[in-house]
Regions:
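Short acidic (Asp/Glu) and glycine-rich catalytic loops that position anionic groups and cofactors
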Residues: 24-27, 286-288, 330-338, 416-422
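Nucleotide/phosphate-binding catalytic cleft detector across ATP-hydrolyzing
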Residues: 1-5, 21-24, 28-38, 42-45, ...
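Short beta-strand scaffold segments in enzyme catalytic cores
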Residues: 13-19, 80, 256, 261-266
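Glycine-rich phosphate-binding loop of actin/hexokinase-like ATP-binding domains
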Residues: 239, 246-319, 403-427
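A glycine- and small/hydrophobic-rich beta-loop-beta segment
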Residues: 304-369
């Protein structure tokens, strides 16, 4: 059996043809073409024809000779506004849920919505508003207040209510005239997050409503196959890899693009002795996405946000500092630009390191010693990745860059701005997705997760 996998990115559309025999996958062909943002279908079908070396690939899919799976993060991906009650509890659970569904958080709100919040939502119009807050049987007034405020707003996006089940009927009555979906609470009680129903609802809305807005309805009509958000498929691949090979049970994957940096980790919620967890337990597999950390479109934002670290990095070469910022401004104006000399290659390395460092810092948990009535204890928020022994770099620059000192950039900041220890991997092997196959194998995992996971491990380069 042959499987074609296509991933439509913001800049490039990647396609691969795999031959499947039993539990083994063999790469037959692999092509890269520019994404036709004005008409995604045009570039998509061009990639299909190229990877299959035919003039018209559609008959091969229609008669069952070749299977097709594809994903997309083009045109900004899936933008979700997350709303919860307490920032470190229900709001954090809402953000984790949205990220696991392949979305990026466009905005987030806690407690009661005010006039400025509503104005911001109306102006940006996210694809979906994930409305959470309150455990089952818990706080009701904030959720009801926010429902009434939303009902009077001009917000026109899909709304998923995944909060306190005790007010589901009232929320339905208040927001019934909106595009409303009600699902199980993402946090029915403080010890048991429940993201699955909301995650599936986000995916369903992506397929029913957003595919057309992203210009993929033509592809669906002609192929009969529906796309998935690229980060969703990669998230599922991370789970499959963790399940298929014990030596890969726990690992971290960094997927860095021109505009964003995604971080995935598979890691158990373990606490070291004399450590207390603050907040909600995290899922075994977690994804975060940083919309301000990227190698091209977001380059200047990275440079401004990380000025202190930039100054430290160029302390021995102060003359290069102005040249570095000039280079970043050039990248923003010309996102397709590739470095032309050794200095610019070095600047790219520094920029990549800053993206990696900050994205992983925001993904990882933190720990700080506090004094209690029973003595000093470590207060931990989030996940402890210090025992993770494998880190993978993917995405255009990280896939190509060899060598890249991942160890240096993960330990560049041991403490965050609040003086808390950042719980990132310390001793690990660094692997590269050198051929950029992971997003493509993630699509294949929808057909055969076992074979896709094994092939993913085999294709990595130390």
């Amino acid at each position: 059996m042959q499987i074609v996998s296509v991933d439509i990115g913001s800049t490039w559309t990647k396609a691969a043809l795999f031959a499947r025999e039993g539990d083994a996958l063999t790469l037959v062909n692999h092509v890269l073409t520019p994404t036709t943002t004005h008409d995604l279908a045009k570039g998509f079908f061009s990639s299909l024809n190229l990877v299959l070396n035919v003039d018209n690939a559609l008959p091969l899919f229609n008669n069952g000779e070749v299977a097709l799976k594809y994903s997309s993060s083009a045109k900004g991906g899936l933008a979700v506004a997350a709303m919860g009650l307490v920032p470190s509890i229900t709001l954090e659970t809402a953000k984790v849920t949205a990220h696991s569904a392949g979305a990026k958080i466009a905005q987030y709100y806690s407690y009661k919505l005010n006039r400025r919040d509503i104005q911001a939502l109306e102006e940006t119009q996210p694809d979906i508003l994930l409305f959470t807050g309150g455990t089952d049987g818990g706080e009701e007034s904030y959720g009801l207040n926010n429902a009434r405020v939303l009902a009077e707003s001009k917000l026109d996006c899909a709304i998923i209510y995944a909060g306190n089940r005790d007010i589901q009927d009232e929320v339905q009555e208040i927001l019934g005239h909106k595009d409303l979906t009600i699902v199980d609470n993402v946090l029915p009680d403080l010890d048991h997050p429940n993201p699955l129903a909301a995650r599936q609802a986000i995916c369903d809305i992506f397929l029913k409503r957003i595919v057309k807005g992203k210009g993929l309805d033509v592809v669906v009509d002609k192929t009969g196959e529906e796309p998935m958000p690229t980060p969703w498929t990669v998230f599922e691949l991370v789970k499959a890899i963790s399940n298929v090979d014990h030596s890969w049970k726990e690992f971290m994957l960094i997927d860095m693009g021109g505009a964003t940096t995604d971080v995935y980790s598979a890691c158990a919620n373990t606490l070291s002795p004399d450590t207390v967890l603050h907040g909600v337990p995290e899922p075994f597999v977690k994804r975060t996405v940083e919309g301000d950390l990227g190698m091209r479109v977001s380059a200047m934002v990275v440079g401004e946000s990380a000025k202190e670290l930039v100054n430290v990095n160029f302390a021995q070469q102060p003359a290069q500092l102005d040249a570095f910022y000039h280079y970043l401004r050039h990248l923003v104006a010309h996102p397709d630009y590739l470095p032309a000399n050794a200095e610019e290659k070095y600047f790219d390395t520094v920029l990549a390191g800053l993206c990696v460092g900050y994205a992983t810092e925001r993904h990882a948990g933190t720990k700080k010693e506090v004094c209690t009535c029973v003595g000093n204890v470590d207060l931990q928020m989030g996940r402890d990745l210090t025992t993770v022994r494998k880190v993978v770099g993917s995405g255009g620059w990280l896939s190509r860059a060899s060598p890249f000192d991942m160890h240096h950039w993960l330990k560049y900041r041991e403490l965050n701005d609040d003086g808390k220890r950042i719980l990132l991997p310390t001793e690990f092997e660094y692997y590269r997705d050198s051929r950029g196959l992971l997003p493509l194998l993630a699509n294949v995992a929808r057909v055969d997760p076992l074979a896709a996971a094994r092939t993913s491990i085999q294709c990595l380069t130390l």
